[in-house]
């Protein structure tokens, strides 16, 4: 019996954060035995915001090495760089012709990013969700892991797929209509200084973010200064509404140690201050990231190995993507190249 297909991507813009790991990359490693996984470094998406060429080049290789370091196995999964598979851009153009301007103008992420990058509101930024739809539909993905900020984009991909199928092939759909992948454990990491907001790798205030490749001393320093509260006497309990900072630190500690919130609350019952708890959180996070960082450094230094991973990944991805693109081209009446 064939496995359900999953598509997920990571953007090589800025340093990947612990939120990227706990919210996505760790799931990638865990899903490989049960799903037919297509994992992508989405460099085409990255250039919707102006990038320094050298920085983008290095960030793409960094992201690929991190994917491998966290346990993505190229023998089990297809791991590739988006721009190495031209079918993404080709299908993206075709899907543009089946997407309404009004649908894109309602995307909240476009509104947020266009406000942030007001001096460079380009067409690519506006059209980002259509390229994302192409990413998903090319591989017949049954499920797509999405965060709250991407739910709208997945809904659009579903709408485009359904629209195209209904026009050209209602009895034998060309595109699989994807469903969201809901993880069994929701690891949402919040900003260290404002735990009401999601941790973002692009946050200008770097005190809010822990990166995957961050030095241990820096990690511990940031967690020691992370938001808590002024409750007297202090208490360690998971109460997102009233103790967002502590709840966020408990989430990190749970993810790093495997302890449940109940076990953490019992361990720190009757604490007189938050300092010892923060110290333990910092040490646990460092211990979780150290083997990933060591493996990353080993892989990043082996360019020949990385080139082979990229080559094989692109070949596998292109073979599958070309089949879908061929069906879509035939459906709309394009003449096949002799």
Swiss-Prot record:
One of its GO terms (molecular function) is tryptophan-tRNA ligase activity. Catalyzes the attachment of tryptophan to tRNA(Trp). Pfam families: tRNA-synt_1b. It is found in: Cytoplasm. GO terms for cellular component: cytosol. L-tryptophan binds at residue 135. One of its GO terms (biological process) is tryptophanyl-tRNA aminoacylation. Gene3D superfamilies: HUPs (3.40.50.620), Tyrosyl-Transfer RNA Synthetase (1.10.240.10). Homodimer. Coiled coil: none annotated. It catalyses: tRNA(Trp) + L-tryptophan + ATP = L-tryptophyl-tRNA(Trp) + AMP + diphosphate + H(+). Transmembrane segments: none annotated. SUPFAM superfamilies: Nucleotidylyl transferase. Its main location: cytoplasm. A motif ('HIGH' region) lies at residues 12-20. Keywords: Aminoacyl-tRNA synthetase, ATP-binding, Cytoplasm, Ligase, Nucleotide-binding, Protein biosynthesis. The gene is trpS. This is Tryptophan--tRNA ligase. Its EC number is 6.1.1.2. Belongs to the class-I aminoacyl-tRNA synthetase family. It comes from the Bacteria.
């Amino acid at each position: 019996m064939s496995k359900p297909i999953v598509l997920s991507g990571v953007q090589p813009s800025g340093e990947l954060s612990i939120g990227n790991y706990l919210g996505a990359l760790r799931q990638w490693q865990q899903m490989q035995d049960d799903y037919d996984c297509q994992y992508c470094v989405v460099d085409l998406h990255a250039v919707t915001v102006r990038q320094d060429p050298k920085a983008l080049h290095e960030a793409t290789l960094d992201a690929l090495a991190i994917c491998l370091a966290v346990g993505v196995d190229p023998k089990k999964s297809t791991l590739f760089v988006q721009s190495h598979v031209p079918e993404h851009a080709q299908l993206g153009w075709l899907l543009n012709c089946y997407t309404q301007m009004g649908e894109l103008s309602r995307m909240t992420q476009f509104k947020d990013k266009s406000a942030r990058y007001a001096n460079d509101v380009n067409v690519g930024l506006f059209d980002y969700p259509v390229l994302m739809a192409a990413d998903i539909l090319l591989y017949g993905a049954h499920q797509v892991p999405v965060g709250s900020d991407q739910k709208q984009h997945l809904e659009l991909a579903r709408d485009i797929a359904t629209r195209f199928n209904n026009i050209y092939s209602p009895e034998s759909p060309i595109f699989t209509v994807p469903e969201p992948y809901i993880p069994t454990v929701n690891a949402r990491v919040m900003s260290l200084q404002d735990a009401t907001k999601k941790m973002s790798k692009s946050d200008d205030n770097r005190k809010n973010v822990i990166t995957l490749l961050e030095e241990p001393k820096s990690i511990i320093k940031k967690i020691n200064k992370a938001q808590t509260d002024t409750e007297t006497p202090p208490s360690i309990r998971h109460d997102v509404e009233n103790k967002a900072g502590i709840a966020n630190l408990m989430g990190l500690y749970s993810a790093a140690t495997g302890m449940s919130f109940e076990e953490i609350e019992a361990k720190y019952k009757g604490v007189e201050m938050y300092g010892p708890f923060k110290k333990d959180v910092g040490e646990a996070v460092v211990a979780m990231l150290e083997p990933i960082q060591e493996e990353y450094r080993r892989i990043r230094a082996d360019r020949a190995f990385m080139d082979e991973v990229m080559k094989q990944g692109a070949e596998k991805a292109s073979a599958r993507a070309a089949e879908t693109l061929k069906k879509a081209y035939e459906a709309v009446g394009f003449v096949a190249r002799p």
